[in-house]
Amino acid sequence: MIGQNEYYGGQVRSLEFKNEQGNFTVGVMESGEWTFEAPVKEWMRLVHGSWDVQQPAGSGGWTTYREGEQFEVPGGTDFTVRVTDTVAYLCPYTGEFLGHLDM
């Protein structure tokens, strides 16, 4: 089963799925600055574009990631992503599904 998530008035959208390799979301973000909570450990892999990441959110420092790069988000933390042009990402994560799937 595939779940759908929408954030920030549709500016960020993702699909989530689970298979024998684990739990995943794959999504797209329009330009803007978006803050997310990560209740469980996850990895944000940039598939297309570039973004600046502030980890944890509000910490002051920004790191730029480009297509093909990833960063790790510890569970129980938050992060902010600053996007200047539409990006696509893959997010493997630990634990149970966080969105709309009932599996």
Give the ranges of each region predicted by the language model.
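Transition segment at domain starts
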Residues: 1-20
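Helix-adjacent hinge/juxtasegments
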Residues: 4-9, 70-73, 87-92
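Conserved short histidine dyad/triad with adjacent acidic residue
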Residues: 10, 19-39, 65-75
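Mid-chain, well-packed structural core segment of small domains
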Residues: 51-83
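Ligand-binding loop in jelly-roll beta-barrel domains
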Residues: 75-103
